[in-house]
Amino acid sequence: ECTDLQHVWEIDRKGAPEQHPDSYQVHLWNSMEGSTPARRVIDADMAAILYTSGSTGKPKGVVLSHRNIVAGARSVAEYLELTERDRLLCVLPLSFDYGLNQLTTAFLVGASAVLLNHLFPKDVVDAVARHRITGLAAVPPLWIQLAELNWPESVRTHLRYITNSGGAMPREVLQKLRAALPSTQPYLMYGLTEAFRSTYLPPSEIDRRPDSIGKAIPNAEILVVRPDGTPCEPGEPGELVHRG
């Protein structure tokens, strides 16, 4: 009934029908191996296009190279101190740079990534407890809802850190989360789709400067500059410039 179907690739002939309709062509995967010259791939080649309106105000497609994705994963994994023992709960869309970064950092260090298509905020809390999650990333609208829930005390023994990006974390929400999860380290992050993350505020600095975007991620340089390109003074609004 698939009238538009033109090609079918069979990976394994076992269990496949001997006869096929004439409306489409059947190709055997094994017979195709080596028939097409291998294309040389370099780290500057495009790996993904992520769509965002965060940096310009208008939707656009951000082209990311393989090198860009790997570099972003390495930087985030370094300051979060990720290891193969970590278990990350992925609740954000993978089409979102913040969501995709959960997978890439897990792949980089060999950690476990648990995918969750949640309907209610409580589903997230239950999954953290059930899968003994060590790292959870979310955006402010979700954190606002999670801060109102009762977190099982057992979570305190394994939820090592939480991260926020995609907007500023309200102070009262952060206070509620820290009260509910006293042994969990919160990382407040700021970033552009082009760079995955640009800055992060270490947990040790939150009490001293809770409204700061923090410092540059590893292997990157950050400046806040005026229209003429000169560096801004502390507290002076300006344009964020990222290199790395």
Annotate the PLM regions.
Residues 133-138, 147-209, 218-221, 231:
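Gly/Ser/Thr-rich phosphate-binding loop
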Residues 70-87, 94-135, 149:
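Conserved AMP-binding/adenylation subdomain of ANL enzymes
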Residues 2-43:
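ANL superfamily adenylate-forming
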Residues 46, 52-55, 88, 94, ...:
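Conserved S/T- and glycine-rich ATP-binding loop of Class I adenylate-forming
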Residues 1, 9, 60-63, 90, ...:
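Short beta-strand->loop structural element characteristic of the AMP-binding/adenylate-forming
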